[in-house]
């Protein structure tokens, strides 16, 4: 069975990705928190903002696996506060988790990914944003750029793509309003499994022709004019 490593598996999109992939793949999960429901064959607890912990986890993965079929850089953190109230420590932590860790993991594990896949979970905030999300938006814009750069550096060996989700409702108790649904051409907000299905699709491209691309999965909200 092919092995796929997924970061950020404890909640939300990462949890859905791990659950979906566990149907076909051996899943290695990495997260700072212990998942309530583990859909992983192997789990490593790691704070991705801590470089020492990250390097130790990479060593453990290399000792366990001779090869990987996929690396899904999903883990991410988000803050939403006025620009004047943000601080450099928040910036550094968001960049560390959302951008530096995917770079380090991709660099370290790409030799194990011969004819495999790297899939980065970015965000539509790489293209459009709102006030108070500067660190997060910058990190996700960087992830899209990292994706196409890696696709060139690893050309012929590893396919590298990113997925940019829009509004994905990761709170099962939240019910979107009629207005919020109407913002989307799809008529609803996204669900974590919407992203998991795209990850599965990209992993099934065994010929590796799909590479260097970003897939916007937002129910059409970024294409629909919404007037206040």
Give, region by region, the residue ranges found by the protein language model:
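Alpha-helical segment proximal to the catalytic Tyr-Lys
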Residues: 111, 151-156, 208
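A conserved structural motif in NAD(P)-dependent oxidoreductases
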Residues: 184-195, 206
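Active-site helix of classical SDR
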Residues: 106, 139, 147
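Conserved glycine-rich cofactor-binding loop
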Residues: 10-11
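Residue(s) in the substrate-gating loop at a strand-loop-helix junction
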Residues: 123
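Short C-terminal tail/terminal secondary-structure segment
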Residues: 128, 200, 211-228
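Substrate-binding pocket helix/loop in short-chain dehydrogenase/reductase
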Residues: 82-83, 90-92, 180-181
């Amino acid at each position: 069975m092919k092995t796929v490593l997924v970061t950020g598996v404890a909640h939300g999109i990462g949890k859905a990705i791990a659950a979906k992939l566990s149907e076909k793949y051996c899943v290695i999960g990495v997260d700072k928190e212990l998942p309530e429901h583990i859909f992983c064959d192997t789990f490593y607890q790691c704070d991705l903002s801590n470089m020492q912990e990250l390097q130790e986890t990479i060593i453990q993965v290399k000792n366990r696996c001779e090869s990987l079929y996929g690396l899904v850089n999903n883990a991410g953190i988000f803050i939403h506060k006025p620009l004047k109230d943000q601080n450099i420590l928040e910036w550094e932590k968001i960049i560390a988790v959302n951008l530096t860790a995917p770079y380090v993991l991709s660099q370290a594990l790409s030799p194990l990914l011969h004819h495999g896949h790297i899939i980065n979970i970015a965000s539509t905030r790489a293209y459009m944003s709102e006030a108070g999300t500067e660190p997060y938006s910058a990190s996700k814009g960087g992830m899209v750029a990292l994706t196409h750069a890696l696709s060139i550096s690893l050309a012929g060996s590893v396919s590298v793509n990113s997925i940019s989700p829009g509004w994905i409702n990761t709170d099962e108790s939240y019910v979107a309003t009629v207005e919020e649904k109407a913002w989307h051409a799809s008529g609803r907000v996204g669900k974590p499994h919407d992203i998991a299905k795209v990850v599965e699709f990209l992993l099934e491209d065994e010929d590796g022709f799909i590479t260097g691309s970003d897939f916007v999965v937002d129910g059409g909200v970024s294409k629909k004019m919404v007037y206040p």
